Swiss-Prot record:
SUPFAM superfamilies tied to this protein: NTF2-like
Protein name in the entry: 3-phenylpropionate/cinnamic acid dioxygenase subunit beta
Quaternary structure (record): This dioxygenase system consists of four proteins: the two subunits of the hydroxylase component (HcaE and HcaF), a ferredoxin (HcaC) and a ferredoxin reductase (HcaD).
InterPro entries xrefs: 3PPDioc_HcaF, HcaF, NTF2-like_dom_sf, Rng_hydr_dOase-bsu
Amino acid sequence: MSAQVSLELHHRISQFLFHEASLLDDWKFRDWLAQLDEEIRYTMRTTVNAQTRDRRKGIQPPTTWIFNDTKDQLERRIARLETGMAWAEEPPSRTRHLISNCQVNETDIPNVFAVRVNYLLYRAQKERDETFYVGTRFDKVRRLEDDNWRLLERDIVLDQAVITSHNLSVLF
């Protein structure tokens, strides 16, 4: 297991993630993109229910990618949202990203840290459409020379095996 970081470093990384979440909630997508490393991998797979006996044996059921995006692909998603023609976001969703249980560890790569957080993403749209996305995120963040941060990897793991929302146009 990798070493945990100092309280100060944990706080700084947590604050970076809180700021990033507020940019998404405020629809400041270009500012959010600026927080991403050029090499970002932004992924989410389907969640499959596995039998207890299979999990004990380490057998993982097959899954499918929901997201497997690069920065270019995320930029295209945001450009589409900015056109006002993305039907899934008309009217725009109101979101709230809640992040908790933040655990930060060092990695073998200098200035790159592994972060695990639990999250709840609340999404409201129109008058009555409400969706909750709950799960765990596995992020990697990079500290830059000027002491700024960039998101290098995000792997989103949903607790739900069935997604009941009309679409997945929100960003996690």
